[in-house]
């Protein structure tokens, strides 16, 4: 286990640890305080509280929610950090948090939490870099299909009483695909 964690990058570990610590604090009775301090800006006076544009990604609402998001982030965010460095992952995290939060807020208001918009950005980034850079990550066939199925499930989930941040998922995937495409083209141009 120690060796496994040693192979992970700092940003992957820090963001994962923050999510876990915040979730534990919620379970210990601090949920209302955490929700209030970390939700996306809901009122005009909160617009200048800049942490709110990313802090919503660190809060999770159930065991399954945090397990799903952190599993994907740990694996694929870790791939990005090991391959391209901590700064790349941190930049992708901050930009994807801000954009997916803005889009989800526009569509449904400020009552949303979780890392899934960032997770979809990470997955989109890894997918497009793998496709355009000769299987850089050696992803399995059907990876993109899995992403689309995940998004489709988000649209039918209300039928089962589960609400998902579909706007955050879709905008996150788009952010990751565009960023990965640009980085791939910049890499290709720098090699020519």
Swiss-Prot record:
Regions of this protein lying in the Cytoplasmic compartment: 1-10, 79-82, 129-141, 185-192
TM regions (residue ranges): 11-31, 58-78, 83-103, 108-128, 142-162, 164-184
InterPro entries: Peptidase_S54_rhomboid_dom, Rhomboid-like_sf
GO MF terms held by the record: identical protein binding; serine-type endopeptidase activity
UniProt-annotated catalytic positions: 116, 169
Topology Periplasmic: residue spans: 32-57, 104-107, 163
Location of this chain's protein in the cell: Cell inner membrane
GO biological process, one term: proteolysis
Domain of life: Bacteria
EC number from the UniProt entry: 3.4.21.105
Membrane topology: Multi-pass membrane protein
Annotated keywords: Cell inner membrane, Cell membrane, Hydrolase, Membrane, Protease, Serine protease, Transmembrane, Transmembrane helix
Any one of the GO CC terms: plasma membrane
Group of enzyme by EC: hydrolase
Recorded catalytic activity of this chain's protein: Cleaves type-1 transmembrane domains using a catalytic dyad composed of serine and histidine that are contributed by different transmembrane domains
One Pfam family hit: Rhomboid
Keyword Nucleotide-binding: no
Family: Belongs to the peptidase S54 family.
Function: Rhomboid-type serine protease that catalyzes intramembrane proteolysis.
Name of the protein this chain belongs to: Rhomboid protease GlpG
Organism annotation: Haemophilus influenzae (strain ATCC 51907 / DSM 11121 / KW20 / Rd)
């Amino acid at each position: 286990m120690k060796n496994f964690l040693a192979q992970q990058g700092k940003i992957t570990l820090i963001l994962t640890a923050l999510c876990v610590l915040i979730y534990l604090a919620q379970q210990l009775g601090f949920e209302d305080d955490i929700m209030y301090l970390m939700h996306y800006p809901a009122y005009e006076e909160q617009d200048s509280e800049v942490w709110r544009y990313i802090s919503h990604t660190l809060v999770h609402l159930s065991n399954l929610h945090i397990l799903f998001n952190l599993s994907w982030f740990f694996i694929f965010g870790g791939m990005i950090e090991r391959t391209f460095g901590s700064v790349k992952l941190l930049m992708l995290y901050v930009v994807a948090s801000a954009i997916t939060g803005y889009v989800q807020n526009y569509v449904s208001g400020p009552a949303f939490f979780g890392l899934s918009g960032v997770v979809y950005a990470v997955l989109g980034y890894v997918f497009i870099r793998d496709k355009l850079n000769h299987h850089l990550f050696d992803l399995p066939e059907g990876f993109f299909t899995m992403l689309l199925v995940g998004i489709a499930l988000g649209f039918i989930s209300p039928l089962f009483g589960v609400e998902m941040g579909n706007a955050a998922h879709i905008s996150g995937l788009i952010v990751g695909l565009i960023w990965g495409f640009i980085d791939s083209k910049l890499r290709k141009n720098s090699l020519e």
